[in-house]
């Protein structure tokens, strides 16, 4: 009997959060191990399907860096990085578009199998993500100048769950590879999302990454600004994205460990949460 009561308590604990976030836009940046491990991938898709089916409005922006690198190697296309960003010449950009499109359609299929009306897009569809060249040395890597959010608003209104590949375009319809974190942040800001969640390969934000006891479960925007200069590496960039989002209309940003099964549900629908909440 006790185990049944525990299950009931889990549902009761989730109820106020389901009510609070009903009809709210939730932007999920999907990447890392949660994309590469089939069991984790299925858990993430289940989480997102549940978010949708209980009344939230999730949108997915996905990465695909490791798959792009593997395909470049297979096809003999040179792939190099500068400051953590892939140098994207014409050939590399074509490979990235192909791989991201393949990933996108697989995600659509996974969610449709869970009863969700999912639809796949890239940033060139309907000029969703308009961008300019980020740096001449990076070739066709784009910085987003405009998000045509009306497309997404109309899809949400029609009960679709948009899944977006981070490919953009300039005014001449040239194709650009866009960092998936940047794309997720820009879209969340344009839609003034209730939440932006980054699925990562770390437990969250650490005050000192070498001290695993220094995990920060919650941090205000002002505290995040003070901490940001002290953080190094990829998490520094991630925290800057969190600050940018919170300063531009996104209510809360979450840094979650995508290696933990059902981390999205644990963060959004439980009192303790998991990972780091910014804002």
From Swiss-Prot:
<feature type="site" description="Transition state stabilizer">
    <location>
        <position position="238"/>
    </location>
</feature>
<keyword id="KW-0418">Kinase</keyword>
<keyword id="KW-0808">Transferase</keyword>
<dbReference type="GO" id="GO:0042450">
    <property type="term" value="P:arginine biosynthetic process via ornithine"/>
</dbReference>
<dbReference type="Pfam" id="PF00696">
    <property type="entry name" value="AA_kinase"/>
</dbReference>
<dbReference type="GO" id="GO:0005524">
    <property type="term" value="F:ATP binding"/>
</dbReference>
<comment type="similarity">
    <text>Belongs to the acetylglutamate kinase family. ArgB subfamily.</text>
</comment>
<feature type="site" description="Transition state stabilizer">
    <location>
        <position position="29"/>
    </location>
</feature>
<keyword id="KW-0055">Arginine biosynthesis</keyword>
<dbReference type="InterPro" id="IPR036393">
    <property type="entry name" value="AceGlu_kinase-like_sf"/>
</dbReference>
<dbReference type="InterPro" id="IPR004662">
    <property type="entry name" value="AcgluKinase_fam"/>
</dbReference>
<dbReference type="InterPro" id="IPR001057">
    <property type="entry name" value="Glu/AcGlu_kinase"/>
</dbReference>
<feature type="binding site">
    <location>
        <begin position="64"/>
        <end position="65"/>
    </location>
    <ligand>
        <name>substrate</name>
    </ligand>
</feature>
<comment type="pathway">
    <text>Amino-acid biosynthesis; L-arginine biosynthesis; N(2)-acetyl-L-ornithine from L-glutamate: step 2/4.</text>
</comment>
<protein>
    <recommendedName>
        <fullName>Acetylglutamate kinase</fullName>
        <ecNumber>2.7.2.8</ecNumber>
    </recommendedName>
</protein>
<dbReference type="GO" id="GO:0003991">
    <property type="term" value="F:acetylglutamate kinase activity"/>
</dbReference>
<dbReference type="InterPro" id="IPR041727">
    <property type="entry name" value="NAGK-C"/>
</dbReference>
<dbReference type="GO" id="GO:0006526">
    <property type="term" value="P:L-arginine biosynthetic process"/>
</dbReference>
<keyword id="KW-0963">Cytoplasm</keyword>
<keyword id="KW-0028">Amino-acid biosynthesis</keyword>
<comment type="function">
    <text>Catalyzes the ATP-dependent phosphorylation of N-acetyl-L-glutamate.</text>
</comment>
<feature type="binding site">
    <location>
        <position position="177"/>
    </location>
    <ligand>
        <name>substrate</name>
    </ligand>
</feature>
<feature type="binding site">
    <location>
        <position position="86"/>
    </location>
    <ligand>
        <name>substrate</name>
    </ligand>
</feature>
<keyword id="KW-0067">ATP-binding</keyword>
<dbReference type="GO" id="GO:0005737">
    <property type="term" value="C:cytoplasm"/>
</dbReference>
<dbReference type="InterPro" id="IPR001048">
    <property type="entry name" value="Asp/Glu/Uridylate_kinase"/>
</dbReference>
<dbReference type="InterPro" id="IPR037528">
    <property type="entry name" value="ArgB"/>
</dbReference>
<keyword id="KW-0547">Nucleotide-binding</keyword>
